[in-house]
């Protein structure tokens, strides 16, 4: 373990933020975990469990929950795990206490609805002196929290610093792989949530596993097309933060996005599904802004377009399926 990283801060005490804190604490480092809700911080500090968002997982004593973002300011690295639509607010609140040159690892997978910006741009807007990094890949919170084998991509431009950070956070069951394509990792993590909703809808409607597989494959083409147009590297999309995360999220009901799509396919309304949840489903906010981004770039993303139209209440699930099935036959192209 490198001596450079001894203390970590984690913004967001939902399931994923708590799981990351648990992973970081396994090697004995001190982890300051910021929770929005005072009762969540209290439960973590007293009962050593996040009963609201990650019930049943005993948390390491090295995790210190707090409601004060300034408590994270002296950490050697920050992991930003607040929902994508709240990332800007939390980063802005950290501005006064963060040391210049601190790595901020972005773990939220989404695009800001108000601006159309990915999280790295949001970070540059709010904390220009921070060093941006992105951690993304096929990883369910419960698996990471329980110490089950998981591999992710950690993308950062400074490979020396990235290597030090990976050495500090790697465990026998949590393996980050170093990359430098932050944009590619962000595109993969954002688009796969929307595609998972589509896959859930297909299974909820009983369209079968063949249709499910086709959605994953054609969805991957949409993801890659967007990434290449925006300037990302094709290789990134073949890795953990692209194809790996896509396959996991589109294939398991543990995924919030997949399960939301499944419920939509079975006839539940979006409002009723969201009302019954205490956790954010990132694909719901990402779908409309992803559609705007694709149109602004002149990119065809019919699956993501269909999901956005359903989410916005413009068409029914049945109409979306019909529209996709009626698309003209064409070559199986991936490149824009």
UniProtKB/Swiss-Prot annotation:
- What are the annotated GO cellular component locations? cytosol
Q: Which keywords describe this protein according to UniProt? A: Cytoplasm, Lipid biosynthesis, Lipid metabolism, NAD, NADP, Nucleotide-binding, Oxidoreductase, Phospholipid biosynthesis, Phospholipid metabolism
Reaction(s) catalysed (UniProt annotation): sn-glycerol 3-phosphate + NAD(+) = dihydroxyacetone phosphate + NADH + H(+); sn-glycerol 3-phosphate + NADP(+) = dihydroxyacetone phosphate + NADPH + H(+)
Q: Which InterPro entries match?
A: 6-PGluconate_DH-like_C_sf (IPR008927), 6PGD_dom2 (IPR013328), G3P_DH_NAD-dep (IPR006168), G3P_DH_NAD-dep_C (IPR006109), G3P_DH_NAD-dep_N (IPR011128), NAD(P)-bd_dom_sf (IPR036291)
List, alphabetically, the Gene3D superfamilies matched.
N-(1-d-carboxylethyl)-l-norvaline Dehydrogenase, domain 2, NAD(P)-binding Rossmann-like Domain
What Gene Ontology molecular-function terms does this entry list?
glycerol-3-phosphate dehydrogenase [NAD(P)+] activity; NAD binding
- Where is the protein localized? Cytoplasm
Major subcellular site: cytoplasm
Q: Where is the active site?
A: 192
Pathway involvement of the protein, from the record = Membrane lipid metabolism; glycerophospholipid metabolism
The GO biological-process annotations, alphabetized, read as: carbohydrate metabolic process; glycerol-3-phosphate biosynthetic process; glycerol-3-phosphate catabolic process; glycerophospholipid metabolic process; phospholipid biosynthetic process
This entry's Enzyme Commission designation comes to: 1.1.1.94
Residues bound to sn-glycerol 3-phosphate are 109, 137, 139, 192, 245, 255-257
- Could you tell me which NCBIfam families the record lists for this protein? PRK00094.1-2, PRK00094.1-4
Q: Report the function annotation for this chain.
A: Catalyzes the reduction of the glycolytic intermediate dihydroxyacetone phosphate (DHAP) to sn-glycerol 3-phosphate (G3P), the key precursor for phospholipid synthesis.
Q: What is this protein called?
A: Glycerol-3-phosphate dehydrogenase [NAD(P)+]
Origin species, per record, is Hyphomonas neptunium (strain ATCC 15444)
């Amino acid at each position: 373990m490198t001596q450079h990283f001894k203390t970590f801060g984690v913004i967001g005490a939902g399931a994923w933020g708590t799981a990351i804190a648990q992973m970081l604490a396994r090697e004995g480092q001190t982890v300051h975990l910021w929770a929005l809700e005072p009762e969540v911080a209290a439960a973590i500090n007293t009962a050593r469990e996040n009963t609201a968002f990650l019930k049943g997982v005993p948390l390491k004593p090295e995790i210190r929950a707090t409601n004060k973002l300034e408590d994270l300011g002296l950490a050697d690295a920050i992991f930003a795990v607040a929902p994508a639509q709240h990332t800007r607010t939390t980063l802005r609140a950290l501005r006064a206490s963060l040391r210049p040159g601190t790595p901020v690892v972005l773990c939220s997978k989404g695009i800001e609805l108000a601006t159309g910006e990915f999280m790295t741009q949001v970070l540059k807007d709010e904390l220009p002196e921070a060093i941006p990094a992105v951690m993304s890949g096929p990883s369910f919170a419960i698996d990471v929290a329980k110490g089950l084998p998981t591999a992710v991509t950690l993308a950062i431009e400074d490979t020396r610093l990235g290597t030090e950070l990976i050495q500090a956070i790697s465990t026998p069951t949590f393996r980050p792989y170093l990359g430098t394509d932050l944009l590619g990792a962000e595109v993969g993590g954002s688009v796969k949530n929307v595609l998972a909703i589509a896959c859930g809808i297909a299974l909820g409607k009983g369209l079968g596993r063949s249709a499910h597989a086709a959605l994953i494959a054609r969805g991957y083409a949409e993801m890659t097309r967007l990434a290449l147009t925006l300037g990302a590297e094709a290789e990134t999309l073949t890795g953990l933060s692209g194809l790996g995360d896509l396959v996991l999220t589109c294939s398991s009901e543990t995924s919030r996005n997949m399960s939301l799509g499944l419920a939509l396919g079975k006839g539940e309304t979006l409002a009723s599904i969201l009302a019954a949840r205490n956790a954010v489903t990132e694909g719901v906010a990402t779908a409309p802004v992803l559609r705007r981004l694709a149109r602004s770039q002149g990119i065809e993303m019919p699956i993501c377009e269909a999901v956005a139209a359903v989410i916005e209440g413009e068409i029914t699930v049945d109409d979306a399926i019909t529209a996709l099935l009626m698309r003209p036959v064409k070559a199986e192209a991936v490149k824009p």
